[in-house]
């Protein structure tokens, strides 16, 4: 059995999990998330905890039990607390603002970049150079942050661009004569 899958996932108050043969659904105050199940892992719910047991002794089933446990733990955290990713815009004239369910970015191009947000993901701009992306699904929040960062990645000489708040950009030295 996987070392990660040995530990059960505790369900906090206000979070419910329903298990069908082919999927698990987690409901909480921030939304509903669904994860498909494989036949290699059996999921059981008892006393407010979810346990993951390997159905057969293959290496694939062992790996899937740990993966599934981590995904379900992220689902439980997502529907109870949520996930967020912070982005900083570094550069002269770089700005962001929220327009409905889209983020409008001014990144030094001749045009503004408008990024549509998927369902379930919210964004806010505490300042013109900060974007906070929030949502219950960790994968989708990270994907949206990566897509926004991709419009103008930090360049290595001045560090201008869109970067994660916890990202450290290594600045190169310019060529000397």
From Swiss-Prot:
Quaternary structure and partners: Part of the 50S ribosomal subunit.
Keyword line: Ribonucleoprotein, Ribosomal protein, RNA-binding, rRNA-binding
The organism's place on the tree of life at top rank: Bacteria
GO biological process: cytoplasmic translation
Listed HAMAP family: Ribosomal_uL6_B
SUPFAM superfamilies: Ribosomal protein L6
Function noted in UniProt: This protein binds to the 23S rRNA, and is important in its secondary structure. It is located near the subunit interface in the base of the L7/L12 stalk, and near the tRNA binding site of the peptidyltransferase center.
Gene Ontology CC terms, in alphabetical order: cytosolic large ribosomal subunit
Pfam family, one: Ribosomal_L6
InterPro entries assigned: Ribosomal_uL6-like, Ribosomal_uL6-like_a/b-dom_sf, Ribosomal_uL6_a/b-dom, Ribosomal_uL6_bac-type, Ribosomal_uL6_CS
Name assigned to this protein: Large ribosomal subunit protein uL6
GO MF annotations, alphabetized: rRNA binding; structural constituent of ribosome
Organism: Bordetella pertussis (strain Tohama I / ATCC BAA-589 / NCTC 13251)
Stated family: Belongs to the universal ribosomal protein uL6 family.
